[in-house]
């Protein structure tokens, strides 16, 4: 039963992406991106709903052309979560999705075109209260910066970002967030560190093109974990070559591990060894699958033997320690003994009961003011 995070977050300006606050004292938002064909409205809406069910706060949708812009407008009417339109090159697409109710525009002012085109996009955003995300990526740096630095570097990423920030500053537009992404962890981390010292706008964190489910999760956890532990970051996206729902799950797991957000169960489980008194791996796999629907924050310990079991179980809302028989702890106190027969069924029942009690207790606390 872990407490508040010891992390002191960087001070930043608060903006709003739809009804979701980003920056300032707002919780760190978890974002993902659809990988469907945007013109396939039904498929895109279906995927967005799955992301919402997983707890996503903001969803980005690619809008490569005017047909996709019209489809985006239909999608926007069918979902409740804030949508970011990802736009490059054609400023008219940005103007159209602004008319259709987009919640945020992801652009690079540098590839939108002439000053008058950037001004038109900024004016449309200002008139409708739409924030902008400046997205700098190591794979698409401006040619002059590639020539100046020879290759992508943290300094090159930051110079590109500040160039775009100054562009918006000249237009007196401050409702924006910035990202400086790279696939190399050290490059991305250093770029964000440098940028965090130079602007007050919120930062959107990500390790771009991180990889598949396993490798991308590791890269993102290492890179974003370093930054978040230093208080840097206001919204995150875990870029995975996998089902976007996995991005949301990994994002919450990273935030939970740093006590920055709580959603669903935080499992503490041993890797198992020959001392285990029940099949820890099988038990964990079954519990994770069965309890995905629980949103209430709970610490659940599943430890196979008595070496570390009692200590871990006492720190959890619900803890299981392997033994003969196994022992269940509730709120740090021994509660009942269980055999291996129907172990998962009984444990699931106890966890759900504890979750219901916590919801009731939290509601009573809120009611008392």
Swiss-Prot record:
Keyword ATP-binding: no
Key words of the record: 4Fe-4S, Iron, Iron-sulfur, Isoprene biosynthesis, Metal-binding, Oxidoreductase
EC number(s) given by UniProt: 1.17.7.3
Binding note for cofactor: Binds 1 [4Fe-4S] cluster.
Pathway assigned to this chain's UniProt record: Isoprenoid biosynthesis; isopentenyl diphosphate biosynthesis via DXP pathway; isopentenyl diphosphate from 1-deoxy-D-xylulose 5-phosphate: step 5/6
GO MF, any single term: 4 iron, 4 sulfur cluster binding
Entry-linked Gene3D superfamilies: Dihydropteroate synthase-like (3.20.20.20), Sulfite Reductase Hemoprotein, domain 1 (3.30.413.10)
GO annotation terms (biological process): isopentenyl diphosphate biosynthetic process, methylerythritol 4-phosphate pathway; terpenoid biosynthetic process
Catalysis: reaction(s): (2E)-4-hydroxy-3-methylbut-2-enyl diphosphate + oxidized [flavodoxin] + H2O + 2 H(+) = 2-C-methyl-D-erythritol 2,4-cyclic diphosphate + reduced [flavodoxin]
SUPFAM superfamilies for this protein: Inosine monophosphate dehydrogenase (IMPDH) (SSF51412), Nitrite and sulphite reductase 4Fe-4S domain-like (SSF56014)
Needed co-factor(s): [4Fe-4S] cluster
One matching Pfam family: GcpE
Residues the entry annotates as binding [4Fe-4S] cluster: 270, 273, 305, 312
Family: Belongs to the IspG family.
Purpose: Converts 2C-methyl-D-erythritol 2,4-cyclodiphosphate (ME-2,4cPP) into 1-hydroxy-2-methyl-2-(E)-butenyl 4-diphosphate.
Name of this chain's protein: 4-hydroxy-3-methylbut-2-en-1-yl diphosphate synthase (flavodoxin)
Lineage: Bacteria, Pseudomonadati, Pseudomonadota, Gammaproteobacteria, Pseudomonadales
